[in-house]
């Protein structure tokens, strides 16, 4: 099987959806017999310090040109100098960074330009949902033929859950406007 590398900044054991997704993807590829090296990048992404960006570029440039390189979304979205990487790159984009709330207009414009350029640079893009694919196509001009949707999975419980009275709904996710908790609460209020 073709060996690959996966560039992930920060601590892979961080308990966020993105890190859990990437940790499971890395483990799943290895379980299928793929030789996937984990490139451990500095934790400052998506706002890399010059030192972290320099170290990341050195690690990524060391990946041979016959070994695909998967880029975490923080790296694909905020990384500069990626055109110097010889390996064919695949971007793993959970949500485009330029579309986060609370960014200054200058920061949003910078991320938009960087993400757009890097999406055009990579050979392929992995996304967790049709919504992310559609956003990349509409806003960044990404070619939908170069995008694969890899939805996150869940571990099924060993036993069926005990019935609750009244029924309970568990919504898992950071409390963030794009997660749609307001939509859920509005629907439940009806």
Across the structure, where does each feature detected by a protein language model lie?
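N-terminal beta-loop-helix "entrance" segment that forms/cooperates
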Residues: 42-60
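Conserved donor-binding/catalytic core segment of Leloir-type glycosyltransferases
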Residues: 126, 161-179, 185-189
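Conserved alpha-helical elements of sugar-nucleotide-dependent glycosyltransferases
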Residues: 17-24, 110, 183, 187
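Membrane-proximal helix-turn-helix segments that form the acceptor-binding/catalytic region
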Residues: 97, 106-127
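N-terminal subdomain of nucleotide-sugar transferases
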Residues: 1-42, 63-67
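Short His-centered aromatic/hydrophobic patch
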Residues: 71-76
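Carbohydrate-associated surface elements
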Residues: 131, 150-153
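Active-site proximal beta-strand in glycosyltransferases
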Residues: 68-70, 83-101, 126
């Amino acid at each position: 099987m073709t060996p690959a590398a996966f560039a992930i900044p920060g601590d892979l054991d961080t308990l966020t959806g993105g890190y859990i997704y990437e940790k499971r993807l890395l483990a799943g590829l290895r379980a299928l017999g793929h030789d996937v090296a984990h490139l451990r990048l500095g934790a400052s992404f998506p706002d890399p310090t010059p030192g972290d960006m320099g170290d990341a570029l050195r690690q990524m440039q060391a990946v041979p040109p016959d070994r695909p390189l998967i880029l975490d979304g923080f790296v694909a979205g905020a990384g500069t100098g990626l055109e110097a990487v010889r390996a064919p790159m695949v971007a793993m984009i959970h949500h485009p960074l330029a579309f986060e709330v609370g960014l200054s207009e200058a920061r949003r414009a910078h991320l938009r330009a960087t993400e757009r350029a890097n999406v055009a640079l990579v050979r392929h893009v992995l996304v967790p949902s049709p919504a992310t694919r559609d956003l990349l196509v509409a806003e960044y001009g990404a070619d939908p033929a170069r995008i694969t949707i890899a939805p996150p999975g869940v571990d099924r419980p060993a036993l069926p859950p005990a019935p609750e009275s009244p029924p309970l709904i568990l919504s898992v996710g950071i409390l963030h406007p794009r997660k749609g908790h307001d939509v859920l609460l509005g629907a439940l209020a009806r």
